Swiss-Prot record:
<dbReference type="InterPro" id="IPR001706">
    <property type="entry name" value="Ribosomal_bL35"/>
</dbReference>
<keyword id="KW-0687">Ribonucleoprotein</keyword>
<dbReference type="InterPro" id="IPR037229">
    <property type="entry name" value="Ribosomal_bL35_sf"/>
</dbReference>
<keyword id="KW-0689">Ribosomal protein</keyword>
<protein>
    <recommendedName>
        <fullName>Large ribosomal subunit protein bL35</fullName>
    </recommendedName>
</protein>
<dbReference type="GO" id="GO:0006412">
    <property type="term" value="P:translation"/>
</dbReference>
<dbReference type="GO" id="GO:0003735">
    <property type="term" value="F:structural constituent of ribosome"/>
</dbReference>
<comment type="similarity">
    <text>Belongs to the bacterial ribosomal protein bL35 family.</text>
</comment>
<dbReference type="Pfam" id="PF01632">
    <property type="entry name" value="Ribosomal_L35p"/>
</dbReference>
<dbReference type="GO" id="GO:0022625">
    <property type="term" value="C:cytosolic large ribosomal subunit"/>
</dbReference>
<dbReference type="InterPro" id="IPR021137">
    <property type="entry name" value="Ribosomal_bL35-like"/>
</dbReference>
<dbReference type="InterPro" id="IPR018265">
    <property type="entry name" value="Ribosomal_bL35_CS"/>
</dbReference>
């Protein structure tokens, strides 16, 4: 049986850390003129994945 491949799209978007999976915020790429400065500031940086999604992402990345 060959090795299972990781989902390359998920590998580009998520990073495994000691406390969970790190990811960037969505809705921050283009057409930002309509968005308020406060909202753009809140979407800056990265955050940890919600606990309910951890199992799905771990399966996609083949992480135990």
């Amino acid at each position: 049986m060959p090795k299972m491949k990781t989902k390359s799209g998920a590998a580009k978007r998520f990073l495994k850390t000691a406390t969970g999976f790190k990811h960037k915020h969505a809705f921050k790429s283009h057409i930002l003129t309509k968005m308020s400065t406060k909202r753009k500031r809140q979407l800056r940086g990265s955050s940890l994945l919600h606990p309910s999604d951890v199992a799905k992402v771990a399966r996609m990345l083949r992480v135990r």
